[in-house]
Amino acid sequence: MTWVSVAAMLNKRLGRRCADEGAAQRVVPALSEADRALGRLDGLARSLPNPDLFVAMYVRREAVLSSQIEGTQSSVDDVLAFEVDAPGWVQPADITETVNYVRAMNYGLQRLAELPISVRLIREIHEKLMQGVRGNHANPGELRRSQNWIGPGGSTLSDAIFVPPPPFEVENLLSDLEKFVHAESDIPALIKIGLIHAQFETIHPFLDGNGRVGRLLIAFYLCQKEILIKPVLYL
């Protein structure tokens, strides 16, 4: 089943009465509240006298938090010191990963003006994100050519918690995902971005950096759809 067919199926289901009234009663108010909150957030961003100045710091904070999920230890102060080449500053070994996140975010936002979310953009973002990063699995911008898996340290393919699709399916699955991103549908934007993120992480198209690219896609989608004028929400 492709994501285009999934979109069609969801459209049909959303057009009917929800079989689980309890779930509908929980989801609809939460979705409405989230939509209102996004509207208020976008309004605040538009009201700032210099939103780009605010966003510049906000992006760096998000870069630190997102990279910390992957185990890095750098701080916002480290990022700023790196950017100005502060004298006497001791550079953390993993600062490159955090600074690359800032660069990938800024690059992606600029590219959206001429290139919508696509497999090509995803690969370009990954290339920026993984440039010069330590380890044997960086492969900037390259889709994986070997099987990966997710599990605790020392786990193998046989006892992994989750095994993504085999590498020969990755390109077609990403193509399906790209079609789903741009398909016209009645799926609310916040639900759709959740589906996009979940499917991207399920495909796990790279050997490393999937989590960070997936989180960047959320911000890119909200800006591409003009739900937010600036990337001021990270999930």
Predicted stretch roles:
Residues 1-235:
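FIC/Doc superfamily catalytic core
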